[in-house]
Amino acid sequence: MDAAIGKVFDSVSDFFSGAASASADEFPLCDSDIISGCEKELAEAQDEGRKKECIMRLSWALVHSKMPSDIQRGIAMLEALVVNDTSAMKLREKLYLLALGYYRSGDFSRSRDCIERCLEVEPESGQAQALKKAIEDRIVKDGVIGVGIAVTAVGVVAGIAAAILRS
């Protein structure tokens, strides 16, 4: 019985700490060495085609970084790239990476917008569908936490009011 109660407390604790969603949020991470390599590769690129490939690799690495500043750099690069793209396949890839960047930076609304645009381009993309589910799960989780905080605040205020009225 104690073990069951312990599991319940652990799962509630994991839910509110974010650990419960870790499996849904497992996207590859990129370290600074890979980012540095991509930056070097871009600096050494001679022709435009090669530069575009290097920019895509660098933006991929940046949005997969552990560092929030890198993620923001990746988002900025991708936002600039999405505007000029006419190829559906490349647009899908850029929108996916942009959605992932927003997701990893905590901007779930923008992330959802980008992933929906991505799915308009390629509705059958399993990668995009998985990210959309992770986004929706996170939005629901944040909503539940927000409601929990609001209910707790109301309870505290009601408790204080009741204590004041009794005295």
From Swiss-Prot:
It comes from Arabidopsis thaliana (Mouse-ear cress). Keywords: Membrane, Mitochondrion, Mitochondrion outer membrane, Peroxisome, Peroxisome biogenesis, TPR repeat, Transmembrane, Transmembrane helix. Component of the peroxisomal and mitochondrial division machineries. Plays a role in promoting the fission of mitochondria and peroxisomes. In association with PEX11C, PEX11D, PEX11E and DRP3A, is involved in cell cycle-associated constitutive self-replication of preexisting peroxisomes. One of its GO terms (biological process) is mitochondrial fission. The chain crosses the membrane at residues 144-164. TPR repeats lie at residues 92-125. It is found in: Mitochondrion outer membrane; Peroxisome membrane. This is Mitochondrial fission 1 protein B. Interacts with PEX11A, PEX11B, PEX11C, PEX11D and PEX11E. It is a single-pass membrane protein. Plants silencing FIS1B show reduced growth, increase in the size of mitochondria and decrease in the number of mitochondria per cell. Overexpression of FIS1B increases the fission of peroxisomes and mitochondria. It comes from the Eukaryota. The C-terminus is necessary for mitochondrial or peroxisomal targeting, while the N-terminus is necessary for mitochondrial or peroxisomal fission. Belongs to the FIS1 family. One of its GO terms (cellular component) is peroxisome. The gene is FIS1B. InterPro entries: Fis1 (IPR016543), Fis1_cytosol (IPR033745), Fis1_TPR_C (IPR028061), Fis1_TPR_N (IPR028058), TPR-like_helical_dom_sf (IPR011990), TPR_rpt (IPR019734).
